[in-house]
């Protein structure tokens, strides 16, 4: 039961940190490449 409580308290914190990091990454990509439908470093 204690392991379940630990899991339930860790999962929201981990998912919040993950979504904050993902949002920051998307914001920085959009800041560096505004309105990019194709990214220059993917096209060869």
From Swiss-Prot:
Chain's role: May help in the organization of the PsaE and PsaF subunits.
SUPFAM superfamilies in the record: Subunit IX of photosystem I reaction centre, PsaJ
Single GO cellular component term: chloroplast thylakoid membrane
Any GO BP: photosynthesis
Family: Belongs to the PsaJ family.
Cell compartment(s), UniProt: Plastid, Chloroplast thylakoid membrane
Keyword terms, alphabetized: Chloroplast, Membrane, Photosynthesis, Photosystem I, Plastid, Thylakoid, Transmembrane, Transmembrane helix
Protein name as annotated: Photosystem I reaction center subunit IX
Annotated source species: Cicer arietinum (Chickpea)
Cysteine-cysteine disulfides: none
Membrane topology: Single-pass membrane protein
């Amino acid at each position: 039961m204690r392991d379940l409580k630990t899991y339930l308290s860790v999962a929201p914190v981990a998912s919040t940190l993950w979504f904050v990091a993902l949002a920051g990454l998307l914001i920085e990509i959009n800041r560096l490449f505004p309105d990019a439908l194709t990214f220059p470093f993917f096209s060869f």
